[in-house]
């Protein structure tokens, strides 16, 4: 269930290392953990940043994976 999709970061708390992405297809917001961010720099996201990601079912429901800033 890891098809690539795009969306905008709804919010991200860099101190806690998680936030939510709003998919562009109108589906439900998706949880994102900093460990899913593909970056060699500090792994953080900013509000309204466009990202590409996949979705996998985690222990607490759907979660973004392989998150890449566009």
Swiss-Prot record:
Top-level taxon in the UniProt lineage: Bacteria
Keywords (A to Z) from UniProt: Activator, Cytoplasm, DNA-binding, Transcription, Transcription regulation
Primary location recorded for the protein, binned into one broad class: cytoplasm
Subcellular localization(s) per the UniProt record: Cytoplasm
Pfam families xref list: CSD
GO biological process: regulation of gene expression; response to cold
GO cellular component, one term: cytosol
A Gene Ontology molecular function term of the record: nucleic acid binding
Residue ranges occupied by any CSD domain in the UniProt entry: 7-67
PROSITE patterns xref list: CSD_1, CSD_2
PANTHER family per UniProt: COLD SHOCK DOMAIN CONTAINING PROTEINS (PTHR11544)
Protein name: Cold shock-like protein CspI
Name of the encoding gene: cspI
């Amino acid at each position: 269930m890891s098809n690539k999709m795009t969306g905008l970061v709804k919010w991200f708390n860099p101190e806690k290392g998680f936030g939510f992405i709003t998919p562009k297809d109108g589906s439900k917001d998706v949880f994102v953990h900093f460990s899913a961010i593909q970056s060699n720099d500090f792994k953080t996201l900013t509000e309204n940043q466009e990202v590409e990601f996949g979705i996998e079912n985690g222990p607490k429901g759907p979660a973004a994976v392989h998150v890449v800033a566009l």
